[in-house]
Amino acid sequence: MFPFEDENLPLFTVGQVADMLRVQQAFLRRLDEFGVVRPSRSPGGQRRYSRTEVTIVRYVAELADGGMTLAAIRRVLELEEQVKALEAERDELLAALAERDERLAALARRVRFDQGS
């Protein structure tokens, strides 16, 4: 993978993100201060946003434009992360359950075969 293909590579400055999304730089700083979007920092301490974070900021800006407070937006993002984690856990459990069902079916076939002998 080339570095520019990495969605999580911190590439963009506050000014670049503000220009891309047509938001104020102060808005981006507030998102960081309130823990809504926490970009990486350069060695010099400047905020650097990945493409993933830019996408999140775009979403956050839409929610803020709709009248949501930063505290409410942070909670929405937290809940969405919890949903993703729970969905991943559910998928793992379903896979384990399917594997167990396959083992049980194989054992049942073996028992039927052994009883038929």
Residue ranges with predicted function:
Residues 45-51:
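Minor-groove-contacting beta-hairpin "wing" of winged helix-turn-helix DNA-binding domains
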Residues 1-10, 19, 33, 51-117:
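Arg/Lys-rich, alpha-helical DNA-contact motif
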Residues 38-44:
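Beta-hairpin "wing" of winged helix-turn-helix
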Residues 24-27:
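Short coil turns linking two alpha-helices in DNA-binding domains
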Residues 30, 34-36:
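Alpha-helical DNA-recognition elements
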